[in-house]
Curated annotation (Swiss-Prot):
InterPro entries on file: Ig-like_fold (IPR013783), PKAT (IPR045219), PKAT_KLD (IPR046846), PKD_dom (IPR000601), PKD_dom_sf (IPR035986)
Signal peptide: 1-24
Residue numbers on the Extracellular membrane side: 25-339
Organism from which the protein derives: Homo sapiens
Name of the protein: Transmembrane protein 130
Signal in keyword set: yes
Length: 435
């Protein structure tokens, strides 16, 4: 019985010890810390870090009315703490780094009367500390281009160096700026702002070297000159606006005739070109044609018209800076001979005519010869004593056996000529013999 009483009493005492932890335990997981810092910083400069307790559900959960119920705890080693301030549900510390590196800083919030209790919220941040100057190189131009790092040629550029020194660590320093614009131009100024005008297109890198010098009092009361440097750069892409499109091509053409149109772009590539044939010269709408990427300032279009009529080439070109439109009217006339219909018949007719001419030429060359008949009259008395055989027998013998009986080919040719005879006489001649 006594043991049961002591057991119950121990439980009551345990719960009593846990009562101070109840608010923090209930609040755990409901809040979070928002951390802000003005880093990065150079060695020796003061860095400010702030932490604010906020609700996780974007403000619908009410924050504690009494800010003294909670306490902020910081860990910032090896950074040196130079100041701390708490106001309401926020806390701010200032630290200095004397060596370069990346240093973690953590913070958490607990109940004010129990720093060993479970944290209500935690936060963590890394501070980059460098031995060089910290800043940004900013390039601006009096144009509203939507593309980053793209600028116009022959238009003034403003190049500025913005030093990042929120703690005014370098407020007494003297600065010297060495500029290199990437096109062979260099200059040295004491001003952090310069103006420059690029005359050619291309990609350039602006380089800047900054030197800061100041005097600092040493622990032994002597003055020493301190120096810090920094190197910065920015990449620039200089473009030319599309001032227009020059179209070179015919304005009158026949159907079934291939046409080539050359487009000369007055601007800097790369370009996106889109074109379409329309009955009228109207601008192209978005999605009305298929865009083509062009890496040069010239482009050739080829097209073959099949139907006569009036047409218009609607052309649109754009680069990363601007866009332009151009139009080119074409009048298409019907062709006199449709090649698709008459090409084969014409070729066949020409071939037949050539073959016929060649045949007639060869035939005339082999058959047209001049015939000369030779008459040999023998008036000697012996001519009647040896009468010739009948003409039929003679012709047959000469025609069939002449080549074999005669001694020379010339005799054979004379026989052939005699067989043809002269023109028939108008009257029949009568032989008269004298004895």
């Amino acid at each position: 019985m006594a043991q049961a009483v002591w057991s119950r009493l121990g439980r009551i005492l345990w719960l009593a010890c846990l009562l101070p932890w109840a608010p923090a335990g209930v609040a755990a997981g409901l809040y979070e810390l928002n951390l802000t810092t003005d880093s990065p910083a150079t060695t020796g400069a003061v860095v400010t870090i702030s932490a604010s307790l906020v609700a996780k559900d974007n403000g619908s959960l009410a924050l504690p009315a009494d800010a003294h119920l909670y306490r902020f705890h910081w860990i910032h080693t090896p950074l040196v703490l130079t100041g701390k301030m708490e106001k309401g549900l926020s806390s701010t510390i200032r630290v200095v780094g004397h060596v370069p590196g990346e240093f973690p800083v953590s913070v958490w919030v607990t109940a004010a009367d129990c720093w060993m209790c479970q944290p209500v919220a935690r936060g963590f941040v890394v501070l980059p500390i460098t031995e060089f100057l910290v800043g940004d190189l900013v390039v601006t131009q009096n144009t509203s281009l939507p593309w980053p790092s793209s600028y116009l040629t022959k238009t003034v550029l403003k190049v500025s160096f913005l030093l990042h020194d929120p703690s005014n660590f370098l407020k007494t320093a003297l600065f010297l700026y060495s500029w290199d614009f990437g096109d062979g131009t260099q200059m040295v100024t004491e001003d952090s702002v310069v103006y420059y005008n690029y005359s050619i297109i291309g990609t350039f890198t602006v380089k800047l070297k900054v030197v800061a010098e100041w005097e600092e009092v040493e622990p032994d009361a002597t003055r020493a000159v301190k120096q810090k440097t920094g190197d910065f750069s920015a990449s620039l892409k200089l473009q030319e606006t599309l001032r227009g499109i020059q179209v070179l091509g015919p304005t009158l053409i026949q159907t079934f005739q291939k046409m080539t149109v050359t487009l000369n772009f007055l601007g800097s590539p790369p370009l996106t070109v889109c074109w379409r044939l329309k009955p009228e010269c109207l601008p192209l709408e978005e999605g009305e044609c298929h865009p083509v990427s062009v890496a040069s300032t010239a482009y050739n279009l080829t097209h073959t018209f099949r139907d006569p009529g009036d047409y218009c080439f609607s052309i649109r070109a754009e680069n990363i800076i601007s866009k332009t439109h151009q139009y080119h009217k074409i009048q298409v006339w019907p062709s006199r001979i449709q090649p698709a219909v008459f090409a084969f018949p014409c070729a066949t007719l020409i071939t037949v005519m050539l073959a016929f001419i060649m045949y007639m030429t060869l035939r005339n060359a082999t058959q047209q010869k001049d015939m000369v008949e030779v008459a040999d009259f023998d008036f000697s008395p012996m001519s009647d004593k040896n009468p010739e055989p009948p003409s039929g027998v003679r012709c047959c013998c000469q025609m069939c056996c002449g080549p074999f009986l005669l001694e020379t080919p010339s005799e054979y040719l004379e026989i052939v000529r005699e067989n043809h005879g002269l023109l028939p006489p108008l009257y029949k001649s009568v032989k008269t013999y004298t004895v």
